[in-house]
Amino acid sequence: MSQQSIREGAKRFSIITAVYNVARYLEDFIAAVDAQDYPSELVEVIAVNDGSTDTSLEILEGWQRRRPGLVTVVSKENGGQSTARNMGLELARGEWVTFTDPDDMIEPDYLSEVDTFLRAKPQTQLVGTNRIMLNDQTGVLTDNHPLRMHFRGGNRLRNIDELPRFFHGTAPAAFFRRDLLNEHQLRFDPRVRPNFEDGHLCCRYLLAGATAAVGFVGTARYHYRKRGDASSTLQTSLTNPDRYTAVLRNGYLSLLRDSSEKTGRAPEWLQNYIIYELSWYFSSQDTHAGAMTAAQGAVSEEFHELLAEITTYLDDDVIAAFDIRPMKRVWKEILLHAYRNEPWHNPFAVMPALDQQQGLVKLSYNFVGDLPVEEFVVGGKVVAPRHAKIRDISYHGRTLLHERIAWVPLRSLRLRLNGRAVDLRASAPGFPVTTRQVGDIRRLVRPPARRSTKPRPARGTTEPRLSWEDRLAAWLSTTAPVRRVYGDAWVLMDRIHDADDSAERLFRYLRHKRRNVNAWFVVEEGTPDWERLRAEGYLRVVAHGSLRWKLLMANCTQLISSHADVPVMRPPAILAFATPSWRFTFLQHGVIKDDLSEWLNPKQIDLFITSTQQEYDSIAGDHNAYAFSSKETKLTGLPRFDRLLEQGQRFGPEERDLVLIAPTWRNWLVPSLAVGSQKRQIKMSDFLATDYARNWLALLRSPELAEAAERSGVTIGFLPHPNVQSVLAELDLPPHVRAFTYHDNDVQELFARSALFVTDYSSIAFNIAYIDRPTVYFQFDGELVLNGGHVGRRGYFDYVRDGFGPVASDVDEAVSHIVDSLKRGPVPAPVYQQRIQQTFPLRDGKCCERVYKEIQRSSGPASRRQPKRATPAPSGLVGRVARRLRRVAVAYLKRASR
C-alpha cells in the first residue's frame, strides 16, 4: 500500500467481529487486538453487537471510547452470526477483511505476519492462518488442529486446484480481498447454520476467483478457544436439527451442485473439503459416550436423503484416497456403497482373531443389501460356522452397512461369496490409490539409505527399556517357585480400589466350592475392602501394584473382572515387562440396557456374562451394534445375584425400612480417568452448578418426601455413584437424609432393606427387581442422556415399556410417585411385578456355578499357557539383590498360597 493511500486514511485490514453474549471473553480479545505490533492507523475493528443481553455492549463501547480511531461499534437485533458479519462487511474500508471471533485471540505479530506474506505474494487470493487450540479451562495452547498439516513447511502460497489436499474454510482465521467479495456480491448465507457458514463463504469466494491461490501463513497464529462449558456454536451444533438438514442442503450440496454445473465436475479440493466435513458426522457417533445427535425421525430421513445426493458428486478415487484426517475404512465404504441401492460386499475377508483353545478363527467382512451366499470351506469341506451373526453399522438413525462375523474351525480355509473366492487377510487392505501427490511419492520411493554405523540393539530385547524393578519381576515370574504358586492362576478383581461386586462373589465361591482352581483376588492395599477381606482370613488377596501382583499377573491364565476399563484389562505396569496370555472374562458391573457397543467392541473379551434374555439377544443376536456373538456371550446371571437373593429373603416386608435414592453419574460431571487409575475427582463448585446437582438435591430436600417417609416409618438414604462420591461430604443434606457410600456399607443389604428404590438410569434397578422391590425412575434429563449425552446410546430397554416402575421427569412428579409407592407398601405394583417375572424367570442361586462352568468351557481342552523362555537372571548388584529377594519370596509364597 502506498504512502499516499495511507495518508488518505485507507485501511490495510478490517477486523469484523460478531458479538453475542461473550462478555467473559471480550477483555482477552480486546487485549489481543490492542497488543498488535502492526500500525494501528492501518487497521479498523468493526464490532457488531448482535443483540447481546449481557455486558458485551458496555465493554465494546468502553473500548470504542478508548480507541476511537480503531474501533467502531454498531448494534442490531439478534439475527445470528452471519447477519452480524454481513452488517460489518458493509461498513468495512480495509483492503483485506477478516472475521475474528470475539471469544478467540490472536498473537501480537498476527497482522504483521499476514502483511509480510501478502507483500511477498501479492497474487494471493485468500490467506489462511494457523489455528492453535486454546483450552478454556487450563489456558494451555496446543498445536493439534486436524488441519495443521496445511502449515507444515513454512509459509507457502498453494494453488489448491493443483494441490487438492489443501483447502481453507475458517473465516475467522482467513483474510479476504474486500474488492473480490463486493465484485461477486459474496456475503455469509444466513441459511447455512448452525455451522459451515464460514466454509460456505470461503469456498464460494475461491470458486469465483480467477485462481484458487491460498496463502497458508503458519507464523500467523490464531488462538481458537475450546470452551469449557461446550457452549460455542461449533461445539453445540450437533444437537441442532439444522446441522443435519440446512447445512447439507444449503451448504455442501449447493457448493457441489453449482461447481459441477460450471465445470462438469466439482474441484477435487472442494470434494476433499466436503469429505472432511462429512467425516465429523461419523466420528461424532463413534465415541464411547455416543455424542448427542438431532438426526432422529424426519430429520434423520432428510439427512440421509441429502447425504445420498452429495455422494453422487464425490469421485470414488477421491473418497478412497482421502487421508487429510483419520478416516475409518467403514466411513469410506458407506460413502462409496451405502447409498447406491445395489448389493455389495468386500472382495476380501479379514481374520481379526484366533482362539487356539477352542480351535476357532474369526472371519469378518462388510456388505450392503442381503447377505451374500456363503460357502465356508474348511479342510476341503463346506461347513456351517460354529458361531455367526450380522452386526449392523448405523449412523444417525439408519443402518447403512452390515458386518458379517463368523467363527469357523481352525484348519485350511477358503471363503466363497456368491460363488467367488475372496482373499483372506489378517487385516483390511488399504484402498487403491490412483493419484499420488509429490510428497507421497517422495516418501514411497526413496533412494537406498546409507548403512548406519550406529550399533543396533539385539532383535527382540527389552532389557534396555526396563527399570530394575521390572527386570526383577520379569526374571522372578519365570522361576519355578513362582510358577508353582501362580501358574494357571485365575485372577479376580472388581475395581482397583474396591470390591464387593461379582468378582468377589465368584472368588468366594471358588475358594469354598472349587478348591481345585488356583484363584486369587486383587484390590488396592489399605482400602476398606482390602482390610475386610484380610480380616476374614483370605490370604489370597493380593495388593494391586505390588511385586506379588506383578508375578501373579505374569503367570495367570484367567483374568475375571466386573469392569472392563484399560487399567483392569491391560494394566500398564504389567505390559511394561510381560506379554499377557490370560483370557478375559467380563462379569459386568450390572445388566446392560443401553448400547455400549462403541466402548466394548474394541476390547478383547473372551467371555461376556449376561443376565437376561433381552440383554443376551441385544449383544449376541443379529442386527445390533455389538461385535460379540454366541461364542463369547453367555446367559448365566451375575455372580453377585446369588448372595443378593439370600439377602432379599432375609428382609420381609415389615423389615424394609429404607427409601434408597441412588442416581448414576454423568460423563460431563467428572474428568477423565487418570492413567492407570479408576478414580475421578470433581470440583465442588462446578458440581453444584449443574442440573444434576440441583434436581437431586431438590428431591432430597423435598418437605413432602420427608413427611411421606415419616408417615411410613422409613428412612431416606442417599447412595451416590462411586464416581460422584467425592462430593458427598460437602453436600448440605437435610438431617433426615442418611448418606451411604459403597465403601462403608454392604450395598446388597441396603438393597434388601429397601421399601422403595429411586434412581435415574442406573442398572442397579435390575438388582432391586431381582429381589422384588419397587422402583421409581427420576429422569429430568432424559432427552439428553437417552440420546447419547452420557455413556452409551439408547438400547433395547425402554423405561416406560420395560422399566420396573413409573418414570418421572421433574421433582414434583418424582415425589408424587414416591408417595404413591409408599402408600402401596414395599412391593411392586402388579404391572411391574409381571415385568420382573418375565425378565428374571430363573432365580435359583446358581449364577456362580454357571459362570464357573462357562469359564472352564470357553478355555477349551487345551491349556492356553505357552511355554515361557526363562528370563536370564540379572547380574551384578541387581543380581545379588534378586537372589536374596528370591529366597524371601519363596518362603513368603509358600505361606501365602495356602
Please report, for each region that a protein language model flagged, where it lies by residue.
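Glycine-rich, basic loop-to-helix element that forms the pyrophosphate-binding segment
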Residues: 75-92
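Short, well-formed alpha-helical segments that are part of the catalytic scaffolds
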Residues: 22-36
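Conserved donor NDP-sugar-binding/catalytic core segment of glycosyltransferases
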Residues: 109-145
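Conserved catalytic-core segment of nucleotide-activated headgroup transferases in glycan assembly
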Residues: 265, 271, 498-518, 639-730, ...
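A conserved acidic beta->alpha catalytic loop
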Residues: 49-58, 80, 101
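Catalytic binding pocket for nucleotide-activated donors in carbohydrate/polymer assembly enzymes
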Residues: 629-630, 730-734, 761-842
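Active-site and donor-binding regions of nucleotide-sugar-utilizing enzymes
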Residues: 374-375, 475-481, 486-645, 668
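Short aromatic/hydrophobic "clamp" motif used to bind/position activated sugar donors
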Residues: 97
